[in-house]
Amino acid sequence: MIERGKFRSLTLVNWNGFFARTFDLDELVTTLSGGNGAGKSTTMAAFVTALIPDLTLLHFRNTTEAGATSGSRDKGLHGKLRAGVCYSTLDVVNSRHQRVVVGVRLQQVAGRDRKVDIKPFTIQGLPTAIQPTEILTELVAERQARVLSLPELKERVEAMEGVQFKQFNSITDYHSLMFDLGVIPKRLRSSADRSKFYRLIEASLYGGISSAITRSLRDYLLPENSGVRKAFQDMEAALRENRMTLEAIRVTQSDRDLFKHLISEATSYVAADYMRHANERRIHLDSALVLRRDLFSSRKQLVTEQYRHVEMSRELAEQSGAESDLETDYQAASDHLNLVQTAMRQQEKIERYQSDLEELTYRLEEQSEVVSEASEQQADNEARAEAAELEVDELKSQLADYQQALDVQQTRAIQYQQALQALERARALCQLPELTADNAEEWLETFHAKEQEATESLLQLEQKLSVADAAHSQFEQAYQLVVNIAGEVSRSEAWQTARELLRDWPSQQHLAERVQPLRMRLSELEQRLRAQQDAERLLQEFCKRQGNAYQPEELEALQRELESQVEELSLSVSDAGERRMAMRQELEQLKLKIQELTARAPVWLAAQDALSQLSEQSGEALEDSRQVTEYMQQLLERERETTVERDEIAASKRAIEAQIERLSQPSGAEDARLIALAERFGGVLLSEIYDDVTIDDAPYFSALYGPSRHGIVVPDLSLVREHLQGLDDCPEDLYLIEGDPQSFDDSVFAVEEHEKAVVVKIADRQWRYSRYPEVPLFGRAARENRLETLYQERDRLAERYATLSFDVQKTQRTHQAFSRFIGSHLAVAFDADPEAEIRLLNTRRGEIERALNAHEDQNQQQRQQFDQAKEGISALNRLIPLVSLLLDETLADRVEEITEELAEAQEAARYIQQHGVSLTKLEPLLSVLQSDPQQHEQLQESYVLAQNSQRLAKQQAFALTEVVQRRAHFSYTDSAGMLTENSDLNDKLRQRLEQAEAERTRAREQLRQYQSQFTQYSQVLASLKSSYDAKRDMLKELSQELVDIGVPADANAEARARARRDELHAALSTNRSRRNQLEKQLTFCEAEMDSLQKKLRKLERDYHQIREQVVNAKAGWCAVMRMVKDNGVERRLHRRELAYMDGDELRSMSDKALGALRLAVADNEHLRDVLRLSEDPKRPERKIQFYIAVYQHLRERIRQDIIRTDDPVEAIEQMEIELGRLTEELTAREQKLAISSKSVSNIIRKTIHREQNRIRMLNQGLQAVSFGQVKSVRLNVNVREAHATLLDVLSEQQEQHQDLFNSNRLTFSEALAKLYQRLNPQMDMGQRLPQTIGEELLDYRNYLELEVEVYRGADGWLRAESGALSTGEAIGTGMSILVMVVQSWEEESRRLRGKDISPCRLLFLDEAARLDAKSIATLFELCERLEMQLIIAAPENISPEKGTTYKLVRKVFQNHEHVHVVGLRGFANEIPSLPPIAAELQQGG
């Protein structure tokens, strides 16, 4: 027997009070004991979170919150966690003894919403010795640990060999793996399945009878029969599609004639207009080409005239340009003459100002000498006046000193003081610190010698200064002349500059004398140069007309060549006429041949269209009539072969359909009579009992039961005996087996298994040997597998049958087409292509026309060459006499050379004219400039310095003399002598003072006189300088104006300018007469051009009109062609035989088709509107749009499941082939798809009966359950009365309601809903659709009512309601219901899970104190019998004797809260012991 999987342990990491705690779970009951707040609910919440990590469902409320709608904001999970990473894991060992750790990582999310982030994961292959806490935490110290994050956990697990870590982003994937491994009992595919599972866990956790589960017991206990519902839905969908296809076939059959008529008339309507427009476009193109040829020829003629006009206009323009140039030159010559006259007048002014300037220069020099002498006298007078003033002041100071000496002592003291002052003054003045009264006499001699030397030097300088004053005025005059001539030069370079100027003076005079001869030579060369330029212009014009560049020496040879060319051209023109006549005759013959072939082309094109259609249908290249007849014989043979093969496929298909119908019987009965017999005998078909057998076991059981696998299992054979009397409607062999259908097994036979076979001992003397069938049919899975194969084979045969039927019809129609072709087109179909011959002839005609045009062009070109050659000869006659002038290449250089020499001579003449007088004056003064112009000033400065030196020497000598004279004052022995001497000295001083004052007065008077005279001289000098500067500035302005005028101002310039003006006037008159002559010729040429242009404008107008028509037609035609090609209708519309009909015939054909189309589309609004728009003759593309719309309309009417083409024309052909065959097949298919109402009733009843039996088996497990006064619990299953009536009517009275089930407008579901409403008119169905109601009626669960009943005391069986039971009884009853649901889920999921997996069973019960000891013992017994685990949360006063009990105590130590846990094993039959089961891991920092 398969061992059931168990939860080994629950691990909490970093929960509130649990840092790292693992609870080992008992195989039966695990009790969490502790006071309020000890952590029991937290532990259960961790378990539930690991089991169902869905935040939309989790809500951990207190029992006091039961019935509350909101509860705490975080739904009880956020507050149970601590900050950081938290884990809740379940350690599971399944039936395969595989250890799996499933769990979640939880983490609080910061914010006011108190959210929690959950990540589920699994660990597979973890060794048994490793505890979950060792994986989830990491030891930091001896009593400290750290919680690993999820990535760290993944790294640690993946580092272990053979251990797999998997993280889930989807809860569905997480639960899918848990289901496959046997952790949960039911596959949770959706959120609704998770909600059911959570409601079950929640009801278990909080105890009592959950209204959420009791109200939905059908959803919890009864499995959904999705296969039956899907079969009904598929059947209805197939019937709906079948009916829609049949309806489409009927509509298509009715529209087939409309298809033919519409496509035929639309093709005639649009193709006729299409080809008419194509023909008109070709005609317009031909007309446009003819007009273009005429236009081009007229343009060529006009171009010739225009060329002549351009040539004359060019010559006129040249003459006009030359006239303009001559007028400009004439005006320039007149202006030049005026300028020469102005320059002559300007030169006269310059000469007059130069003479005035020379006179002013002389006067200025004289006055400068006078002012210089006055300045010197002024300086002498100022010096004498200053010396007189100093002498008077000194004498006055000496006299005042002597007058103050009133007595001897005072006088001695004064004298002594004066002696000391004189000594100090002498020391300072002589700069002799060592001077004393004793050595003063010696120094006096030295300074007397210095004074004498200074005086002699002064006399020498006075002598030199007098000489320099005489030469100073001449130097200034010569220097001013140099500056006037050469510009600003330094005084030191004046002599050298003057020498150079005088040296260049003779050469400048020589150049000035050559001006007149050079001007005459230049005039002669310029005249020849102008003649050469005129000749070059004529040569350039000649080369331009000839189109080649010729050298002057080549002109004579060219003249001879042009004369010979004229002779040749005159001969070639005469031969052109005969050749033109021959080409025109050939052109007429080609036109006649083309007309004949054009009449044959339509018949041949019609035959080719028919032949191409036959080639497309046959896939053969039919090249002659023999191949056509041979292919007809092949068609007859192919039709016979295909018909035989089709009949064979139809027989095979019927055999497979019969086998499918036999295998599709409900309950696996190959004979429908067995189902009725089973109901009559009250038994069950053996195939129905083994309906769930797997496909792997099907061969064994099929061989085991042999022929009896179609037997009926009855509870008692004796009760069946009476029914066998007179039994006629049954198979030939009917097997009856006695046994309980609910617990039937194969123990009734003695079996020996062999390889791929069994030996069954039916009796002691009777054995049966049966081999495993190659295709087992026992069990639903085997039948479905076989049916799938048969369905595929049937579809293949149906497809092949359809293909063969289509081929037969197609072959028949192809044979008929070949017969029509032979009768109508065989005679002309294989003739040569007339259109190809027409194209060749048209090509030849185009060649001849082009050759004719080329001939005309060549002839015209030769005439032009003839005229051009004659014109060239006349031009050469003018050019040849000028060849020598053209070959003179040095003429321009010589003109340029003479021009440069003349410019130099004129420049020299202007120089001599301007500076000749100054050079004449400068020549005798050249020697004066040799001395440095600055020496006079330096001499004056030396003289002043010498005067100062002499004065200083005198003062020094006077000071020393005074010291020597006062040497006696340094002694004080003789006072009287000193007084006498003092009195004499005083008198002398007074006399000298009087003389000095008189001298001072005379010096002042003389200084005033000289100052007045000097002022007068300076004013005169300033006046002269001002006049000189004004005259000089005016002379510079006049000279600059003369330079700006830019013409020579000599005597012959005016005569030359006047001669040049007269010459240009004569040339201008000659040019004007030639221009008038050209204007007259141009007028005649323009008259001829006007006549040509009028003709050309008419041709252009006609050509542009027809070209505009062609262009507009081309734009529309391009749109039409693009539309035609994009939609693939070119082959239908481009009917070449219509190209040979004229426009009236095509228009008549289109109008007839239009009338028929108006009637055909009268009922179709869209096509009617498109047809109305297409009638616009200016918009041919609208007819194409109508044709496309018709095609699209017909294409939309084609069902692709019926006809294998998108082309309506081909669809019409295929339609006739397919419609009849499809109608027959679909009608038969509808009869096979239809299901009888009795079969539906039997299926639903069988399903209800099976589920009732299953629930009765579940009830047997709850009969011994008792809680308090409740002695037993059971589940009642009843069929609703209204639904039971519906089943009876479906099985017994279906003939009365065939109007519903035989209606093609109602599906089976809708008919079932209508029948239900008819049977229950009092029920309000609301706004629900019949289809929805019918689908609900096909679900057997809606036929059943489920109620939970309890047997309680004297009341007997009562409905289980919380109000009628105590709390403990309600908890126990609810637990019983939950156990039943879990069992139901396990059975329902058995086929989805591996055979070797028995899932874990575990429920919860919080606050179990409401149960008494007996009820708890009942729970223990229930868990033991059902191999179920239970986790109970109980207060401290409960001490169960079985299972495992954990004592939880919440403690606070140093602000750290943790739960102390002690675990105890049960001690009912053992010695009590209190060791802890799991060591407590102290909470880490």
Curated annotation (Swiss-Prot):
Annotated GO MF terms: ATP binding; DNA binding
SUPFAM superfamilies: P-loop containing nucleoside triphosphate hydrolases
Flexible hinge: annotated segments: 666-783
UniProt cross-references to InterPro entries, sorted A to Z: MukB, MukB/SMC, MukB_hinge, MukB_hinge_sf, MukB_N_dom, P-loop_NTPase
Record note on domains: The hinge domain, which separates the large intramolecular coiled coil regions, allows the homodimerization, forming a V-shaped homodimer.
One GO CC term, this protein: cytoplasm
Keywords on record: ATP-binding, Cell cycle, Cell division, Chromosome partition, Coiled coil, Cytoplasm, DNA condensation, DNA-binding, Nucleotide-binding
Known role: Plays a central role in chromosome condensation, segregation and cell cycle progression. Functions as a homodimer, which is essential for chromosome partition. Involved in negative DNA supercoiling in vivo, and by this means organize and compact chromosomes. May achieve or facilitate chromosome segregation by condensation DNA from both sides of a centrally located replisome during cell division.
Annotated Pfam families: MukB, MukB_hinge, SbcC_Walker_B
Entry's Gene Ontology BP terms: cell division; chromosome condensation; chromosome segregation; DNA replication
Residue ranges the record marks as coiled coil: 337-480, 509-605, 780-805, 835-915, 977-1116, 1210-1235
Record's subunit section: Homodimerization via its hinge domain. Binds to DNA via its C-terminal region. Interacts, and probably forms a ternary complex, with MukE and MukF via its C-terminal region. The complex formation is stimulated by calcium or magnesium. Interacts with tubulin-related protein FtsZ.
Similarity comment: Belongs to the SMC family. MukB subfamily.
UniProt-recorded name of the protein: Chromosome partition protein MukB
Gene3D superfamilies: 1.10.287.1490, 1.20.58.850, 3.40.1140.10, Immunoglobulin FC, subunit C, MukB, hinge domain
Annotated ATP binding sites: G34, G35, N36, G37, A38, G39, K40, S41
Main location group: cytoplasm
Subcellular location: Cytoplasm, Nucleoid
